[in-house]
């Protein structure tokens, strides 16, 4: 039977901001003594972490990795750029990629519950609290992504600004086109397309754009309206759709043209299956 009341447990959680499981552990270790339980949690580096959780986190890093387990992305935010470049913080972020890949997770809450690959005696949430204690700032795991990498795929990753923006590109048709995939990922970070292709633009967005274009040419003859609208849609697709964009390193060719050229040279049926683009705070 526990040597503490639910009221004591509630008070410990309110004082420290630490999770229920660790608070119970602390009270059991302290034989129900609230002050001793707080000391126990402080020694673990957990108690003061809870007090930092209200602080704003505008800096941080987006990290990515691809290996035989799949591809993973994670965005982790802190208060200052100084801590964003701290080696302890970066080691924590790197461990999260391993955790995502090991457990095939894209959910931040689920990630927080698994045992950390960096410190197997602690959950990710507990290790985050210890890291907060070490670096002296609030840490927030904002989002996470995982997807398997299939046979016959080439994956390219490009990171810009020390992890301020990251893109991952998945090419099908070959396992030997990582350089092309990375070039396209670099292009995505620079050009920030919203969609893969014209066909992938949602119908409601097409209708919205058509309404905007039509209002801009109201009162003109119908054939003029159609011609102008077609031209505006072409410009919209060239700006918003990856495959229609001019390649940043060679504006004379579109991304689709770049892929077609590589496919012809290699004899492989290459295509972009999908891409992921994250920008810090977006």
UniProtKB/Swiss-Prot annotation:
CDD domains recorded: UBA_EF-Ts
InterPro entries listed in its UniProt record: EF-Ts_dimer_sf, Transl_elong_EFTs/EF1B, Transl_elong_EFTs/EF1B_dimer, Transl_elong_Ts_CS, UBA-like_sf
Coiled-coil segments on the chain, per record: none
Tagged with keyword Cell cycle: no
Region feature Involved in Mg(2+) ion dislocation from EF-Tu, mapped onto this chain: 80-83
Summary of the function given for this chain in its UniProt record: Associates with the EF-Tu.GDP complex and induces the exchange of GDP to GTP. It remains bound to the aminoacyl-tRNA.EF-Tu.GTP complex up to the GTP hydrolysis stage on the ribosome.
HAMAP family cross-referenced by the UniProt entry: EF_Ts
Protein name: Elongation factor Ts
Native species: Chlamydia trachomatis serovar L2 (strain ATCC VR-902B / DSM 19102 / 434/Bu)
Gene: tsf
């Amino acid at each position: 039977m526990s040597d503490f009341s639910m009221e004591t447990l509630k008070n410990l959680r309110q004082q420290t901001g630490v999770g229920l499981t660790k608070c119970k552990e602390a009270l059991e270790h302290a034989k129900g003594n609230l002050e001793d339980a707080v000391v126990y949690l402080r020694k673990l580096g957990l108690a003061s972490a809870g007090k930092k959780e209200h602080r704003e986190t505008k800096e941080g890093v987006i990290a990515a990795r691809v290996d035989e387990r799949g591809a993973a992305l994670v965005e982790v935010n802190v208060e200052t750029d100084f801590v964003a470049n701290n080696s302890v913080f970066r080691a924590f972020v790197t461990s999260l990629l391993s955790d995502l890949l090991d457990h095939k997770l894209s959910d931040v809450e689920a990630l927080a519950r698994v045992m950390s690959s960096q410190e197997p005696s602690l959950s990710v949430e507990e290790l985050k609290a210890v890291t907060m204690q070490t670096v002296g700032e609030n840490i927030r795991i904002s989002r996470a992504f995982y997807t398997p990498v299939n046979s016959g795929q080439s994956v390219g990753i490009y990171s810009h600004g020390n992890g301020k923006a990251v893109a991952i590109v998945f090419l099908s048709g070959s396992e030997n086109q990582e350089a092309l995939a990375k070039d396209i990922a670099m292009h995505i970070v620079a050009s920030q397309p919203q969609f893969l292709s014209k066909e992938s633009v949602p119908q409601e967005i097409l209708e919205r754009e058509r309404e905007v274009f039509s209002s801009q040419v109201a009162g003109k003859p119908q054939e003029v309206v159609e011609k102008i609208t077609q031209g505006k849609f072409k410009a919209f697709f060239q700006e918003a759709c990856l495959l229609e964009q001019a390649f940043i390193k060679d504006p004379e060719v579109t991304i689709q043209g770049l892929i077609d050229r590589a496919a012809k040279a290699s004899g492989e049926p290459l295509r972009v299956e999908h891409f992921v683009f994250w920008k810090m705070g977006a």
